[in-house]
Amino acid sequence: LCDRRQRQMCIRDSISDEMRALVRDLLGLPKRQLFVTSTPTDLSFVLTMPGEFDLTGLTYNEVPPAKNVALQKGDYFAYLAQHDLLLALPYQSINPFVDLLYEAADDPDVVSVKITLYRLAGSSRIAAALAYAAEHGKQVQCLLELRARFDEQSNIDYSRMLEDAGCDILYGLTKYKVHTKLCLITRRCPGGICYYTQVGTGNYNEKTAEQYTDLMLLTCLLYTSPSPRDTR
């Protein structure tokens, strides 16, 4: 797909008014498929502009993401065993989830980490945390959707990086894109197995988590083996 995209028909070109009818005829395009606009199709360059100019007096004061005071000590497993945690991005930071992955990697009672990945940030701390967990003996499974539009090559590169670190990589379904944002951490707890689950509306992307409005819920379920009386 990445190679084919370089050879497909163009979707935008800069031409004079005189060339418009000729090009339309040569390409066999009906009028309804030809749009004339002065707006660039790709506006990603706008994201770099604030750093190029002095915007003093033109912007609001920066509001840093709020921190959860209850999590300052960093014992996420103990906290989530007693409380659910709902993060409202970008007003709160995605860092607690990233820290949870690193805590899972270092916790000897954690058995596995399973996660679905769609769009990751460049130099992704989440991908680094998953690789770190696999390198520290955790079973890490990543369902990585390669067909995230315009992020295909990035996802291919991340799949190789994660696989080299020891993660098990799955590539989703043939007919459908996997947009689900789910993470499941399995951990041995006194009395049974604890399932720490994260479900959210936004990608596992630390950069867009500072811009897009999303919700991220972290919760925990303790599963205890049924006693003989319970199985009757």
Regions found by a protein language model. Give the residues of each.
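Single conserved hydrophobic/aromatic residue that forms the stacking wall/gate
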Residues: L1-R7, I11, Y223-R232
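N-terminal non-catalytic structural scaffold regions of very large proteins
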Residues: R4-S112, A127-A129
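Beta-sheet entry/capping signal
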Residues: Q8, D84, V110-K114, Q139-Q141, ...
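Flexible loop/turn segments at secondary-structure boundaries
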Residues: S14-M19, L43-S44, S93-P96, R119-R125, ...
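Short secondary-structure boundary/capping segments
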Residues: V23-G28, A129-L130, I156-M161, T186, ...
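Primarily the HKD phosphodiesterase
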Residues: D107-A165
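Phosphate/diphosphate-binding loops
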Residues: L146-Q211
